[in-house]
Amino acid sequence: MLDEFLGGLDGTPSCIMGNNKLISKLRACARRASMYQVTKDNWGNQVENYGSIPFVDMKTKPGTNDEVVGIDDDAGTTSLYVARLAMDGLHAVSFAGVAPVQIWLPDFSTAGAVKKGEVEMNAAIALKASKAAGVFRNIKVK
């Protein structure tokens, strides 16, 4: 079913994203299908792949232990997300005439050990081709 889902996209996705439980099950399936590969990125980090597509564990929300991609407790299902990151697929955008990252530094000429500054990021995403991203819902993991 995963190959059928990936085949419905307009190209090879840049990543397969989900929660830890789903990624673990996909990893096991990929091993059985001889599609599991482990490579190292430019920084020496181990990257697990389904063929040439890296698995991405979305982990938990900052400051909590809640999964970014949750599991429905009643049905025991979750969702799988894929995206082809490219200028003609899914990519980041910033507002016209505004720098994506704005920085306000504190006044270092005043006395005091504690200074206050700000950093603001203005960004959004654009999906240029509807088949460049997809979600596979209701995958049983429990």
Protein language model regions, located:
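Extended amphipathic alpha-helical segments with heptad-repeat/coiled-coil character used for oligomerization
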Residues: D10, S14-I16
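Sequence/fold signature of self-assembling virion shell proteins
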Residues: D3, G11, S24-K142
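Structural motif
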Residues: G18-K21
